[in-house]
Structure formats: C-alpha cells, structure tokens
Design a protein with these regions (language model features):
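Conserved active-site beta-strand-loop modules that form the wall/rim of enzyme catalytic pockets
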Residues: 127-134, 172-177
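Metal-dependent nuclease catalytic regions and adjoining charged, substrate-binding loops involved
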Residues: 5-6, 144-158, 163-248
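Metal-dependent nuclease catalytic cores that hydrolyze phosphodiester bonds in DNA/RNA
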Residues: 1-131, 138-140, 151
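Short, solvent-exposed aromatic-acidic interface loops
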Residues: 135-139, 182-183
C-alpha cells in the first residue's frame, strides 16, 4: 500500500507516471528513416552505424524517463530563446510559410537535417543571413563551452553547424550559436565561421556509414578498450564487443 504521508513516495509515483507517459510517446514516434546530420560528429563510426541501422540497444540501455525530460527541457528552452531573440530585434525565421521546419536532404534522402532557424536581419555587428542553432546545457557543460568554445568543447554540435551551413548554403556568414545554462539561465553566444574541410569530412563520413551499412560491412570501432569512457556510455557496448568473438 502506498504511503501518502511520504513526500518521497509521492514524488517517485508522479515521476514514474510522467516517465511512463514520455516513454510511451517516444515509442509511438516514427523512427528516422535517414542518417541525421546532428549525429555525424560522434566519435565512433560504428556507433553511428548502429544508430543509422536501428540496431536494438543493449538491454537496459533504453533512454530513461529522466533523460527524456532533459530532451524536453531543450525543446522548451529553444521556444523561449526564439521569443527572446525576436524581442531583441533579430529577424529569426524558424519555419517555412507552410509551417514546415527548414532543413535539407542529400544522398537520395538518406542524409537529412533540420535547423533551428535562420536570422535574416537584426542588430548591427552581425552578418545576415546567418544560421541559428541553440542548445540547453547543464552548468558544467555550459562552463566548458564558455571556456573552450564550440569546436573543442562540443565537436558534435560543431559538425552539425558546419553541415547545416554547407547544405543550406548559409556558409558565407558565421552561424550564430546560442546556449542557455539550464541552471543559471546565462546565455552563451558564439559566431561560428564555416569550416569547409570539416563539412567535407562529415559529408564523406555520412556516405561511408550509409555505404557500409548497405553492404553489410561493420565499420571499425573508435576505441580498442571496452572500458573506455565512450564505450561505457555507448548504447551498443555489449553488441559491439561481442563481435570480437567473430574477429571483428
């Protein structure tokens, strides 16, 4: 029997109900049929290949409700930033006239991405049009970004930005990247110049992952030790290292 006098019991119950609802919604969503540009910067091509091929994650590695709530926080933060940017005088466009999100598709639609927005005008000191991308980060991650800048601190996000700049032909002006500190609500902004070499490497990587998957070839793992931090955090750690018995 539930103890209604216990705040911890009530908290656990409500959290569990919310998480179940979020997990149900996620399960009902149609899975991507393409390789997302937002993921191409991950360190391990094999993990990226598992993700693209929709390989089942290891038992117990499904996204917990708490992580889904963090994802939801990011969406809500983005909506707030859109309003704040517009109130600050930026002419920020986030959808086409028909309501669809701006994006691109390449490689017969098997590589695709959707951007947060395009800023077509606004205050002095910026060049327009400019790609706009926004993230919501915990304080530790945000501080690291502030200290080391996007390319070093968040290489996945950096790859995402330059790919969008390339495929949407927004490469002539620096992207405007913003990040909200979820704890303090501080806002970090960085002007991100186009990196043609990185965009080409990421585009080549997409083709490599798609081609290898079509051919049934398993790409090399990025690390040689299953206890490496990246491997321990990977949703396919067990699946990947079981392959070693097959000489792969």
């Amino acid at each position: 029997m539930m103890d209604f006098n216990s705040s911890s019991s009530i908290s656990c119950q409500v959290s569990a109900l919310i998480d179940a609802g979020l997990q149900k919604r996620q399960a009902e969503q149609r899975p991507r049929s393409y390789l997302g540009a937002s993921r191409l910067g991950v360190s391990c091509e094999r993990a990226l290949q598992y993700e693209f091929a929709k390989a089942p994650v290891d038992p117990g590695r499904e996204h917990p409700g708490r992580l889904l709530r963090i994802f939801e926080r990011g969406h809500l933060s983005e909506e707030s930033m859109i309003q704040w940017m517009r109130q600050a005088g930026f002419d920020l466009r986030t959808t086409k006239p028909n309501g669809e999100q701006f994006g691109f598709a390449a490689l017969d639609g098997r590589l695709a991405g959707h951007i947060d927005g395009v800023i077509v005008g606004g205050p002095d000191g910026f060049k327009y049009p400019a790609l706009w991308e926004n993230k919501c980060l915990g304080s530790k991650s945000w501080r690291d970004l502030e200290k080391n800048k996007l390319a070093i601190s968040k290489p996945i996000y950096h790859a995402q930005v330059v790919l969008y700049q390339a495929y949407l032909e927004l490469h002539e002006n620096p992207a405007i990247f913003t990040a909200v500190n979820a704890d303090s609500m501080e806002i970090y902004t960085e002007l991100v110049p186009f990196d043609a070499a990185l965009a080409q490497r990421m585009s080549d990587r997409a083709l490599k992952v798609i081609s290898a998957t079509d051919a049934g070839e398993l790409l090399a793992r990025a690390y040689q030790d299953p206890t490496h931090f990246e491997c321990r955090m990977c949703s396919w750690q067990d699946r990947c290292w079981r392959q070693i018995n097959d000489g792969r």
